[in-house]
Amino acid sequence: MAEAAKSRGEAPAALPTWPDEIYHVLKDAGIRQVAMVPDAGHSRLIRSFEADPETRVVTLTTEEEGVAMLAGAWLGGERGVLLLQSSGVGNCINMLSLPVICHMPLLMIVTMRGDWGEFNPWQIPMGQGTRPSLEAMGVIVNKVDEPDLVASTVQGAAHLAFNTWKPVAVLLGQRVLGAKNFKELARK
């Protein structure tokens, strides 16, 4: 996007601050383990945790492994977070019974696809099904569409998950992330 702005004679937009804010909120919440499937929407947050010697970052082969890993972390006395994209939520549905039935906290931060401004029709079904699927499994869901509300939403979700031993997901909408543009992606 910065290159497109530059070619139109506009100043590039400043980097958003919410990824750094999420990092600090999660550190303050005692997060020591990060389970993730690589995702561009989480890239700055992932890099921050990878650079943190106090945090263990585990790259998963599939998202549901993170649910089990974080249940184990909790049983071992540590807090963790699962970072994933909405398209990976479908992979977690059966495994979500673990924290629900066993009354374990689970904090998930989900970057959304398939909503506002989406260009890829293949992302729409799971993007639209993410919230109802999570709620059907007993997960408390908070969606945020304003960058200024990201940190406080994640903070509230972390408190809710770890104080009540419930699974909680924060959905970061495409208004926060920025909708991808196929024409711009094709030029890169």
Locate predicted features.
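Thiamine diphosphate
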Residues: 2-188
